[in-house]
Amino acid sequence: KALEAVAENYDYAILDTPPALGTLTVNALTAASWVVIPAQADAYSLDGVTDLAATIQAIREYTNPDLKIAGILLTRYNPRTSISKIIHEDAEAMAAELDTKVFRAWIREATVIKEAQAVKQPIFAYAPSSKVAYDYRFFIEELMEGING
């Protein structure tokens, strides 16, 4: 209901929720059409994906049967490390179980992200020419292609 007043002014509303599966996240998933599952390229992050997948299934059962998973987005990713490669393989297996995909785009580990957060600016304002800004652009393009068909 909160978005209804402004819905006609926007094509999309992006709800960035905390990683904890609390009331805010459940409410956001209830209101959403699509969900992107972010996963850091570390050993424990995919455990969170499993928990979120269970929550998504419950949301589909009880409040939002049309909720779709757009894909899994790997973050803090470094393709040169063996752990990132292992996490990518595990994410691919998990995506197959969830009937979704791992995005071709990924977000690299970069100090500039922390700097932008510290000064409370989006990466596109703080460092629009950075490699990580390119990562986000590539991800947005891939996401929009998937959503819009």
Regions found by a protein language model. Give the residues of each.
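Phenylalanine-focused residue identity feature
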Residues: 98, 103, 124, 138-139
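Histidine-centered active-site loop/cap adjacent to the catalytic His
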Residues: 128-149
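Conserved catalytic-core segment of NTP-binding enzymes
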Residues: 4-108
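Short, glycine-rich, amphipathic interfacial segments at transmembrane boundaries or analogous
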Residues: 109-115
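C-terminal boundary of histidine-terminating zinc-finger modules
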Residues: 116-134
